[in-house]
């Protein structure tokens, strides 16, 4: 597990979109928005803590099935992943996600908040 140090300010609301890991302490259902990491499409949702994000490989993508959790720990972030997607593509996405800045995270949080719910 690697730590991704980011300093950000956050505020969002929740709207249902898609199911996320039931073991996660937060609900991560705001959004989603679609982004590309590691050359593959990902659905990004923000969590009820207003600071954490979940990246789910889009169904049919080469990284699927896989999920990354960017979890706010109080002072910084933990980036963890799990699933059975193609390792080449999940590793490439992981490398891209490690490069996210505080501004990038804030932009993603704001974009998920602004996303229209997918019914």
Positions of PLM-derived features:
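Sec-dependent signal peptide recognition
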Residues: 2-7
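N-terminal signal peptide c-region/cleavage motif recognized by signal peptidases
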Residues: 14-16
């Amino acid at each position: 597990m690697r730590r991704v140090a980011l300093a950000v300010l956050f505020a969002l609301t929740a709207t249902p979109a898609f199911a996320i890991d039931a073991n996660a302490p937060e609900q991560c259902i705001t959004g989603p928005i679609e982004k590309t990491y590691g050359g593959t499409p990902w659905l990004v949702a923000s969590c009820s803590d207003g600071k954490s994000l979940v990246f789910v490989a889009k169904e049919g993508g080469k990284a699927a099935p896989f999920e990354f959790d960017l979890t706010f720990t109080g002072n910084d972030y933990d980036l963890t992943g799990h699933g059975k997607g193609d390792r080449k593509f999940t590793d490439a996405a992981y490398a891209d996600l490690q490069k996210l800045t505080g501004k990038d995270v804030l932009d993603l949080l704001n974009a998920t908040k602004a996303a229209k719910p997918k019914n």
